[in-house]
Every structure is written in C-alpha cells, then in structure tokens.
Curated annotation (Swiss-Prot):
UniProt keyword Kinase present: no
IPT/TIG domain sequence ranges: 806-895, 898-982, 986-1095
Disruption phenotype: Embryonic and perinatal lethality, due to defects in brain and neural tube development. Mice exhibit abnormal cortical layering and defective migration and differentiation of several subtypes of cortical neurons. Cranial neural folds fail to converge in most embryos, leading to an open neural tube and exencephaly. Likewise, mice exhibit defects in the embryonic development of the cerebellum and the olfactory bulb.
Protein name, entry field: Plexin-B2
Carbohydrate attachment residues: N127, N242, N393, N451, N798, N919, N1053, N1072
UniProt-listed GO biological process terms: brain development; excitatory synapse assembly; homophilic cell adhesion via plasma membrane adhesion molecules; neural tube closure; neuroblast proliferation; positive regulation of axonogenesis; positive regulation of neuron projection development; positive regulation of translation
Amino acid sequence: MALPLWALTFLGLTGLGLSLRSRKPESFRSETELNHLAVDEVTGVVYVGAVNALYQLSADLHVQQHVVTGPFMDNKKCTPPIEASQCHEAVLTDNFNQLLLLDPPGKRLVECGSLFKGICALRAMSNISVRLFYEDGSGEKSFVASNDERVATVGLVTSTRPDGERVLFVGKGNGPHDNGIIVSTRLLDRAEGREAFEAYSDHTTFKAGYLSTNTQQFVAAFEDDFYVFFVFNHQDKHPAKNRTLLARMCKDDPSYYSYVEMDLQCQDPSDPQDSAFGTCLAASVATSGAGRALYAVFSRDGRSTGGPGAGLCVFPLDKVREKIEANRNACYTGAREAGRTIFYKPFHGEIQCGGHLIGASESFPCGSEHLPYPLGSRDGLVATAVLHRGGLNLTAVTVTAENDHTVAFLGTSDGRILKVYLAPDGTSAEYGSIPVDINKKIKQDLALSGNLSSLYAMTQDKVFRLPVQECLSYVTCAQCRDSQDPYCGWCVIEGRCTRKSECSRAEETGHWLWSREKSCVAITDAFPQNMSRRAQGEVRLSVSPLPTLTEDDELLCLFGDSPPHPARVEDDTVICNSPSSIPSTPPGQDHVDVSIQLLLKSGSVFLTSHQYPFYDCREAMSLVENLPCISCASNRWTCQWDLQYYECREASPNPEEGIIRAHMEDNCPQFLAPDPLVIPMNHETEVTFQGKNLETVKVSSLYVGSELLNFEETVTMHESDTFSFRTPKLSHDGNETLPLHLYVKSFGKNIDSKLQVTLYNCSFGRSDCSLCLAADPAYRCVWCRGQNRCVYEALCSNVTSECPPPVITRIQPETGPLGGGILVTIHGSNLGVKADDVKKITVAGQNCAFEPRGYSVSTRIVCAIEASEMPFTGGIEVDVNGKLGHSPPHVQFTYQQPQPLSVEPRQGPQAGGTTLTINGTHLDTGSKEDVRVTLNDVPCEVTKFGAQLQCVTGQQLAPGQVTLEIYYGGSRVPSPGISFTYCENPMIRAFEPLRSFVSGGRSINVTGQGFSLIQKFAMVVIAEPLRSWRRRRREAGALERVTVEGMEYVFYNDTKVVFLSPAVPEEPEAYNLTVLIRMDGHCAPLRTEAGVFEYVADPTFENFTGGVKKQVNKLIHARGTNLNKAMTLEEAEAFVGAERCIMKTLTETDLYCEPPEVQPPPKRRQKRDTAHNLPEFIVKFGSREWVLGRVEYDTRASDVPLSLILPLVMVPMVFIIVVSIYCYWRKSQQAEREYEKIKSQLEGLEESVRDRCKKEFTDLMIEMEDQTNDVHEAGIPTLDYKTYTDRVFFLPSKDGDKDVMITGKLDIPESRRPIVEQALYQFSNLLNSKSFLINFIHTLENQREFSARAKVYFASLLTVALHGKLEYYTDIMRTLFLELMEQYVVAKNPKLMLRRSETVVERMLSNWMSICLYQYLKDSAGEPLYKLFKAIKHQVEKGPVDAVQKKAKYTLNDTGLLGDDVEYAPLTVSVIVQDEGIDAIPVKVLNCDTISQVKEKIIDQVYRTQPCSCWPKPDSVVLEWRPGSTAQILSDLDLTSQREGRWKRINTLMHYNVRDGATLILSKVGVSQQPEDSQQDLPGERHALLEEENRVWHLVRPTDEVDEGKSKRGSMKEKERTKAITEIYLTRLLSVKGTLQQFVDNFFQSVLAPGHAVPPAVKYFFDFLDEQAEKHDIRDEDTIHIWKTNSLPLRFWVNILKNPHFIFDVHVHEVVDASLSVIAQTFMDACTRTEHKLSRDSPSNKLLYAKEISTYKKMVEDYYKGIRQMVQVSDQDMNTHLAEISRAHTDSLNTLVALHQLYQYTQKYYDEIINALEEDPAAQKMQLAFRLQQIAAALENKVTDL
C-alpha cells in the first residue's frame, strides 16, 4: 500500500536532514598563520589578518582581495623607515597582524602589524588593496601596536562624542623593544596639525612604570554608553600571581582623569580549595534577555591541580558600573590609610585617597585633575562560573540572543565550538559541539555575521563559516526537542523544526513548541481505552498541547493503513470514528495495536500518533493452556464466557443467563488440586483431584490426558466433586523432571484444568549412592543394591541406607609449596551427601583444612594444605562419616620448593606492559591462581604458568631499579639478586608521512628514542563517532565507537620503527580519530609540532572503457580522484597480470606506469573465457587493490619477412602521407590567408577609427559622469519585485500589458467573494500536494491543444501561486526536471535539453532563475547593465536617427545603420517647463531631430532623476518656440510640412529654422494630440477624401519599388551595392563598438567574473546538473556546458540584456534595442564552444567582436570552472534562501488571481484531470479527485459570475 503523504514528506525531510548535516562547513585556508578576524555587519564581508597577508573574503569565504604585508627588512630595535645604512641588523622579518578593526562610518579598515614598531595603515573597506593612509616616517608618535608578536594588542574605533571625531583606543602590553605605552587614544583623521594614528592629545597615553616587560596581556576592548573598557591580565611580582583586570575610562577624556581599573575573579564551583581561575583568555560583550553583560572565559594551567580547566563567567555591566562607582567613592571620600590596602595607582605606584567631599564621584563622572587618578582597586567583582570544563581550555567566546534566550558559542583548545544555553537562573547547558579543526586551537576572534545566522571561527590557518543552528536537519519533533537547541522549536502546523521567526503561526498558542521546554504534541489518553475489533464507535483522544486550529487546518484521523477521515475537535479532545478495517490479530495475542495518526493540511503534516488496542475475545480463550474460560474472563478486556456454547465473546450491555462476566473467573467450571503433585516414571500412579462450579458440566464422561506424552485416561467420579484417574507407565529420558499440564475434556470440549503435576526420574544424574540419597525426599528415591542404581522406592526390593566408602579418582594441583596455603581439589564419588559428612582430609601426610564453599555433593572436596618441613610425596586420605577413602598409587601429591633464578628482559618502560620471563626450578608448583609476582609492590600479572613463568609489568610512578618478588599461596619464595629496571618511557619525535588512506597499509616511519625497551608495538586508532553524525545515522544504522589495532611493524633500532597504518571506517569525516602508538603499556599520540596524523577517504579510479585497455604505447594511463592525497609515486604500485608496472607519474587525477614489454600472464587464469585470459591491470595503494580492467597487447605476427614488409608497406604509406600533408597544407594555408586577410582588414579598420574611438569614448565618459551623478542622486531605477516578476513572467503572454495577472484585477461580486476565495485557498492546498500537482502538469502536457505559449503562461501562473513555498516549488521543478532529463538521455540526445521552453518545467526554471537572481541584479549586476544601456542610448542619440525607418548613424547593428550621410548640427536649446517654477534647462538636440524626438530628449533631461513611468508622454506635452515676440507651436506634421508628390517630410528643428541657444517652452495639454504609438503608424493623417496615398519620411526617403520587369541580374547588382554600402559604413560600426567597449566589458565581467559573488541558486543548480551528468554517465563536457549555458546565460542573462525594461523603469527605443541585440548575440556566441571561422560572408556583428570573442569564451569557461570549485550550497542553505525570498515578496503578488487563472485550466481539462487522479494509487489514497470535485462544486458559478 502506498505511503501516506506525511510519511513521504517525512522521508524527504529525513533525506534533507542527512544532506544538511553531511555537508562540510565553508572554509578558507591561508598559507600563513592567521591572527585576527573582523566581519562587516552590513555587507557581510570578512576581513582576515594573517602573517604577511590581509584577506578580504566574501560572506561565504571566497577571496575578493589579497594584500601582501610582508616579509620586509626590519629589526625590532630599529626605528622606521628602515635603511640598510642606518639599521645593519635588519633582516627579512615576518609581519604579524596585531590589530584589525573596522570603521564603518568612515568605510575604512584599521590594520596594524608587528613590523616597523607597530605602525598602522588605513585601508578602504570596499577594497583593502586601496591604502588610504600609511606613514612610516613620523617617529615614535605613530608607533601604535606592539612590535612583539607575543604581546597582544587590542583596540576600539569609536567617537569621542555622538557628533565627535572618530578615534582609536589602543591597549597593549610592553614588549622588550616597545615604546612603553600601555593605553592610548589615537586620531583617525588629520586634525590640528596631527596625522592619523598620532595621540589624540599630549596626555592621552599611559606609559608603563614597571621595570620588567610584558606584564600585561590585553584580551579585549569594548564600549558601553560614553565609556571605553579594557580587559587584560596582569602578572603581579609579589606575590607572583596573575590578576585579571577591567579598566574603564570616559571616551571624551583627553587627560585620562577617568581611568579606573579593578579585579575580575571567576570562581570555579568544582574546586573549592583553589577557587578561582587564573587567566582570562577571551571576552565578549553582548545584550541578551537579562541585559548587557561581559562574558569572559578563564583558564587554569593545571600544574597545581593535575590538569587544565576553564570556566565561563558573566559580569552584568550594571553591576560593573555600580562596583566601579563604589570604588571611586570609597577612594575619594574614605580614610587614607585604609585605602592603601585596597587602592593603588596603575602604571605609577601608590595613590593618595581620601580628603574629598562626599558626592565627588557623582559631580565628576569622568574624574578631574584634583581627584586621584589613575585609580586601581583590588576590590573587584567576583562571579561564579556558569560553565566549567576540565581537561581543556576555552579560548574564544561570543554571545547572542534568540527570542530573549542567551546563547554562547565557546571555542576550545582542541578545535571545537561548544554551543551553550545560558538560562536566566544562572545555570548553563551545553547542547552541542561542532568539531571545527580537530586538535587545532580556536583563536580568540569568534564573530557572528551581521544577520546572526552564521558564526565565523578561526584556527591556526583556517577560517570556517558555521551555521548557528541546524533546525531543519531535525525531521521529527522528538529529534527537535532532544536537540535542546534554543534556536529551534517544532512548528506544528508545518511539521518541521524551525526558528520561531520561520514558523508562520508561531505566536498562536501551541503552534511553536520550544525545544528546551521538552514538549511535543502527544495523545495523553483515549476513551474508550480499547475497543473490540467487531465494534463500531468513536474514539475520543486527549491531546496535549493541542494547537489552536481553524477550519482550514483540516485535521484528519488515520487508523493504520485505513483511508484518513476528518476529525472533530472539542476543547482539547479530538474525536475520531473507528476504522472500517482492522489488521488481523497476531498469533499468540488477543489484541492488535493499531496506530492512530492525527494529520494536518490534507495529510501532509504529521501531528501525533497513539497505539490503540483492538481486542478479539475469540483469541482470548486460547491464551492460557487448558484454561479457556479463565483465560477469557480474566483478561483486561470486557470479554465474557458463554457456558452454553463454550465460547468467549464480547460483553453485552444487557444481563444474560449462562454467562461468566469479565473478571469473574472464579465462577468458571474447573478442575484443580491434583494429588500427588509428583509422579515417578515407569510406574502407574493413582491421581485424585477436585472439581469446582461443575453445575453445567456433564461429569459422567470425563477424560484426562496430555498431548505432550500422548496419553488419555478415563476419569472416575467420587463423592463431593472428587475425581481420580490412574496414569500409565510414563517415561521421558531428556530430563530429571518434566512438568505436565493435564487437560480435562467432556464430550470433546476442554474444561478448565489446573491439574499440573511433575514427572520425575530418580536415575537421571544420580550415578552413585551419595547422589541418590541427596535427592529431594518428595521424590522417594532409594539406592537399590541389587540393581546398583537409584530408583523409585516401589521399584526396588533390596533397599540400602548406607553408601560404600569414598573413591578418589584425581587431585588438582598435584604439587604444592613447602609453605602450604594453596587449595587442593579432590575429585571422586561417594564423597558424602552433605558437607558435614566430611570428617577429615590428609594430603601427603599433612592435615588439609576442609573448605565447605568448594564442596559438591559426592563428587568434589576442596581443602587448604598446611606447611611441610621438607619436600615429600604421598597419597590422599578422606574420612566420610567414618568410612575411609584412599587415593590409588598413581594419584599422589608432592611438596616441593620453587626457586626463581633469573628474569628476562631486565628493563622496560615506566608505563609497564613488558612481558617478563622468569626461569628457575619447580616454578610450576601449585596452579596459576596460586602464584603472585610483584615489582616493588606493583603487581606483575601472571599470563603463563609452567616450567617458566611469564607476567606483564604494571606502571611505576618513577623510573629506577626494583626487586622482583614471587609468592606461592601467600608465602614468599626467595629470589636473591633478581631485579628489574624501569626506564623512562620512549618518546616520539617525528613521523612521516602525515596521512593515510582509510584502507590503510601505508608505511609510517616513526622516529624517537627508547624504542629498544619495547617488546610489542601497535598502531592504534580510536574512532569516536561525532555527535552530529550519530544523529544523522540514526535511521541508516548507528555509528559505534571503533578501536582498530595495527600489529604490522618493522623494528629497526632504538630510534626508528616503521608501521603499516591499519584500516579504519570508510567515513573518516564521521569520526573523531585519535591515532596512538602503543609501546607495551605506554600509549603516545601520533602528534608532533608538524601536525597530527590523519586519515583521508580512499581515492577513486575510473575503470577502463569497455573493461579492456588497448596497449598501443609505452605507458598505461589511469584516471581517478585524490590519487596523491595520501600516496607518493615511490609508494604506489601497479601490476599488469603477475608482473609489475613501473610507476612513472602520479598526480591528483592521473597515474602513468610503464608495463612489461611482453604481455604477462593474468594472476587468475580463466579456463573457458579466452577474453579473460588477458592480464588484469591492478593498482595497489597500501592494503587496497583496484582492478581497473584488462590490458590487451598487440600480439599479431606475420610470416612475411621483415625485410619485405618494410619496403612494401612503408614506401606507399610514406607517399600517401606526403601527398595528403601537401594537399592539407595547401588548403589550410589558403583558409589561413583568407582568415588573416579578414582579420588584418578588421584590425586595419579598427586602427583607422581608434583615435576617433578614444575621443568619443572620452566625450562619452565625461557625459556619462553626469548620468552617474544622476544615478547616485536618484539611484538606479530598479523595478520593485512585483513589477519585475510581472514583466519577466507575463509580457510574453498574448495579452501583454493587459494581462489580468499584471493588472491584478479579479472582478467577483461581493456576495460570492467569500465562497470563491475560500475555494481558491482550498485549491492552493491541493496544489501543495505533490501527487496532485505532478498529475495536473502531466495531464495538461499530454493535451494536444495545450500549446507552448499556454505552457509558458501556465508555468508563470504556477510560479506566482506557489511563491509562498519556494522550497516546495523547487522540489517540484527538480522532480519534473529529472523526468525531462531521463527522456533526453533515453533518446540519446541530451544536448538538446533546455534549448527552448517547450515544457512547463523549462519555463519554471526560467522563472526560478529570475526569482533567485533579482537581488543579485539589484545589488551587483544591475549597475553595469544600466550604465551600458544608458551609454548606448546616449551614443545613439548623438547622431541622426531616422524616426520612420528606425535607423541611426551610430549603432552596432548593420541592418539599423543609417546608410546615407545626413547633414546635421548639434544644438543646445534652453527649455522652460511651464507651471513648474524650474529655471531654464539646457538640452542638447540635433537640428535634424523631429519635434517628437526633441520632446523625448527634453523630457529625458528634465525628468532624469525620476523613474521613466513618472515621465509625461511626448504626446501629452506641447513644444512652443518663441523666436521673438511671437510664439509658434512646433509639431511633427502641419500645414508647413514639405511635400513631394505622395511623400510628406516630418518637420525638424531645421525646418522651423530653430537656432543654437533658442528658447523652447514645454507645457502640458489636457487631451492627447497624438497617439503614443505613433512611431508605428507615423503621423498618418490619412484623409481618404483628399489624399489616399500620403507617405511620410524623415531623413532618408525610401527609393520607389523596383519594377517587376527588372531582371534578376539587376537584383543581384542591387544586393552587391547594398553590401558594398554596408562595408563602407563598417568603420562607423567599429567606431561605436570601440566607444562602448568598456561598458560591454564591465557588464560581461559583472556577470561572468569569478571574483564576484555567485548567487547561491546558480551554484546549487549547476551542481545539480553536474550530479545528474555523473548519474547518467555523461562524460562529454560539451553537453554539460550546453546545459549550463541554456539554463543561465541564454535563459536569463540574454533575456535581461535584450529587455532592460524587465528590471529597470526605462523605455527602450527600437534603435537602442538593435544595438542591445548585437551585444546579446555576442554574449550567446561567447557561451558556445563552437569555433566560428570568419569569412567575408560572416555577419557584421561577428566581425565586430571577432577579436574579443575568445576572451569572452574564456571568461565563460573560467566562470563555470570557478562555480564548480566553490563550496557546495546545501539543500538547507538553499531552502533558507528561498524561504527568505518567499517571506519578503509573496504578499505583494497576485496569488489569488493566479489561483483563479490556474483553475481555468482545471476547468478546461476537468475530466482528463479527474481520470488521471483516479488512476493514481497515491492520489486515490489521499482522495485528491474527491477534493478537486468539492472545489469545483464551490466554484461552479464562478465563470458566469465573472
């Protein structure tokens, strides 16, 4: 049966969750060590300071700019500028970035390095390669940062006052060659003769007063209100300890009167003795629900406490402020003597407190010269750590708030990010840990992105971008709840884990369940609690918490696999009808549990579920053997027993006779109390039993029996319900006892029987007399002397009560030490019935103390031997109840003295683990358990016992010689002179290589010292699953902790061992791998300063095409990926069959080796298949082998002698080759000459117009500067999102601008509106069913009359309708796309895919790209496109434009080129706009312009700062010229227009004789005088009665039509003349092209340059295409290139380029459109891989851009290549991006109108859609056809109403 929709959704979400988690974090790697990181909160740009480098990265960590900052010649002692003559000690020195700060108001970046005494530079934030200020010759006043990289520098850029200048506050320690300044305030702008970075005033610095250097290490600087704060560590000398201090000063305090500092202490709650952490490592200030606070992480080095530790403390800033003010007040007004113990003067010594008036601190909030300053206090703030960790250090902290919940992200010393929730009550909870860069410390700069969605972390050489939450990866409410992520909660109505802001109804009660409140929607109770499977009724479910639901939420009940049905809701109770069908009851049960599922949104969202039992009374009677009535009446259901029919059935509400109701099982007829309870085997026994409640039982015919032993006997009835029967002789050999449950039948029906007896066998397991007499007396077993065995007493006539004497068969051990004290075990028979029977034991003449704990009846006695004075061998004697037993001669015990003589080896590691071999005599005395070996009281575990002893040493606290001691049975035996020496553990100094493939087998050379001490080495890998992967693999199979031991190694000497790396699990990224070298008992991590040993995934190889490689040259080539990631050329091996293939080259993707000259035999020869007798090609990397196919040598031989073959074959072949080469050379030379000739001509033409291009380009740039200023003033007129999508989606539709989707009008009578809208919303829900929508689309596309235009329109309507759920829209598009791709691949023409938009999905892709790239157009690519459009428009309008023929002098299009030379002159006219009070505006026009053209240019100039849609139309204004006192209205056509026969010429300014400098007045009219589209039907004033054939012209009058009688030859000449004219004017095309070239290049670079940020949608879709190509095994790069080209450049960019009005509020004239078409065609040519050879017949546009096309093609190739190399965009990131677009813009679209339009298609093809839905099983299950019918019923009058 098909899965329900919610289950499919769940599976999809599960896949999404896995893909979300499987992605690796985005990262950037630096070649040098990283120092600092800063993030621009507005642009998202990331700035990174490193050693010798600065980086400007995009938000996704792609490099935008890279600046080299070192190394340079310097010495810490020298003063810059560094000159060799002045600084002889200067050497090439690295530049460590000491300070990296942003100044967003100034759009600049502050960076200071360690070179040149720590001077700083200002750089542009937009481009860090632009240095705004740098001065290295100002001397000490410009030394800002420390020039010692070990001394930290912190800073803060702020303003001294709200409107004050920007300054830099700096805090740094005092390095050995620093200037001693600790705290300073620096200028950022020149002021009052001071340069940037000089001190703000002469007093704004504090210098160190200490003699020692580097006593301060600054941690952080921050601001709060009008104060600046510093956090730093200070090393006190007396006593020597570290203090963490917080310093504060006023921003606007040029003299530092306000400086005050105090201690900060962070208490460790886990260590009351050493209760405070010592050093602050990182600090961050954040505002959370509890207010603004300082969050600081502290560490403890662990030297005194046995290990490192760290804690997080919180210091609320209001408490900081209170404490500082209290300290100030105490110093100002307190006693002087008392203040000396608390207060001090930082940097200078003692301070004089006291003597000031009360209130001085309030009167002088920023201190004063007469008050003590600077002020330090040892009385500071103390906080208890809200989080503490042992074993590691916390190295970074940043804090944020989500819905007033405080979240801290903490970096650790082992390369992880801890996610911690800080509760309002002061407690904390770590809810996640992200392994960022294992065993690499997280650096202090931990930053959040501006939108708080990402976290940037930095290690030694990498920057990582991590999501702050992964809510969408938790696919169930339980997973969401268990994550405990404060960002996440379960969005009930959407059935997914989201942030609160992403849940549409989060503010409604019960709709967003916060993860930390640990609640999910659950069914807490059901009434009734169970139901008979044969009953019908309602089930009332108590649901908590039940979200508030509306009628539209459609709550459904689903019982098991039954169809869902609507549920009713009453308060917090959901009422469901019982299902019509119930699964069968499982065998052995009386009920079946059926899952009740509550679903929302037509079954697409799972709410909760509950197991509900349906019971079956017919099965209840057979649950207990032989007790049908009791089983029925005693179960937990309401079943009852029918005495008449002997059946179990459901209870009836009415009283009935002959019924035993539920829980009245005592009333059942039954038989019980058998006597006797035990029955001997092989003996007939009389059994009596009782009856009860037998009134309805016919006791006259009763039978008793057992199905197990297959017997049945008649029952005899006695008085008082007593019965009896006689058993036959029963036997069963398998056991001592056998429980029997006897049945009782009456007329074939079972009566309840509790007759349980036990059948027993006396002989079983009782082989001797003692064992027999020890049996349970109830069995009445006796030892029968005559039979010599144990039997039932009635079966024996010769019973004895006494047993024979004991028999001893063997002892263990057979030897013992003279000191005794060991246990001896005596085995035999008749050794007594109980322990008390054993009276005395003698071993070798010595008493042996009985040990009752080891006694076993009759078979075993254990005793402890006593000491013996001398060695002796003797027997064993046992006294059992006065009967003596003696051991036979071969069972003897020997007293002997063990004597150890020597031990090997004599030394081993301190960690232990050495196996010692002890030699001596009689060492095998006793048993292994009796021997104990110690080394200086440290146990040596005995592993081997015999003539030699072996033991494994334990760990010793210190190295040295120790004595070996051996104990036997507690007594020490002498071992004179035997000692063992513990040596220091071996040490690993280096290893190489640093990595291995997961399959292992790589030789790892480990060097160090002390290896000769070791006996056994092993390379051990501990694979600990990462927490995130544990959750990820919960469905696919949990990951377990794995420990792998590699025992293969070669020992060389004391300093070198070579290991073979062991194989580890195949997913190394899923585990935290710890690699150790185990040396006996010592384990050392395989980690040195060079790095940590790591595993990488195995390489992949491509198999040979067809499985066989033809060997035609000397090398075999194999392809793959990651081949050299953990393998070198020297290590790699390859084989051809049984022989080696000599390795020649190994790169990341290629392997070359030289095979044997003669074909070797295969490794595994096949007998029958001759093809398989070819040798295999095998690649071996370490332990793993890859068989890539077989190698076929060319083994053909000829009987013809070689001396004949060479002349006969070679001579003709050489002749043919020579002739062919000559012919080919001639043809190539001819084509090359033609190509070079054309190219030369083109270059010559370009050269001839180059000077003109330069001049015109310069003029254009000057004029475009005004345009640019207008753009900056008014902004680029980008359309709003709705208008943009309307134009992109619907302009191609047949109704154009009048399309109802654009107008947004839906005319519905008010009386019908609620019904219609409700139905449309239901239709929207139906569209959100994937099954319905796919069927809907397939059905429409199968209709013949569903044209390509209709598909385009339908897809656009669908885009608008689903815009609110773009993630779902994308899923639908992907599904349809996979189907489309399958069709093309099956048809073997994949290159044709996406060439047009002939399917719905192709248009959906166009719309999807348009949606996803809108913001990119708006932010990035829009400006160069707009400037290109304006440049073309400006250049076209500089020359004549024929208003009738739409041709221009300056154009890129040869068909739109104005052929004739037209005389014209530029004019500048003054224009006054009437009634607007604007001064006269100069406007440039041409004297050949028509009046309409003049109007357009005037409007363009006057209203240039307004969007085009706000401009007046040319036909709505009147142009008036006032040459003198008179006024003349100018128009295109009037009575003065020039006439020539049938032709009338349009008036121009020249016609009216308007001169340069003339004044024109523009005024508006009420009624349009001329239609707007007059350009198409130019001023046709056709008065049929006066002139039938009036024709108009402007600049060039068309020639009369050629007579029909003209010959074809004449026509050919005309064509040639036209072509000649075009070529003549080609220079003009080149001139325009050269003028516009920069704008064209800028646009191409903005779209195709890899340096620009690529929209995530492009990366996402291109990766999708790559994946599908790989899936379908499409290796042809041309095909993939075509797919990408058709999906983005040709589908989107060409469309936007040809139609700028789609994105901008502009009007595109035909002459501008013609030039745009040429550029668009060039863009299209650049995207094709086909090479176009130029000839004289080539189109002029291809000739125009012949030189540039190769550059553009490379840009496209590089663009595609760059995208492929980008970090993958995960499904989660894409869905988040799409969700943001949905939220931002959906409300502005005409969704309701789109739904109505879509419904028209449903109405048109109603029957076909219904049939399709009814034939689809999934649609049937969800009742989609029925739901559509309901919607159609609601909308049936809609068409007529509309």
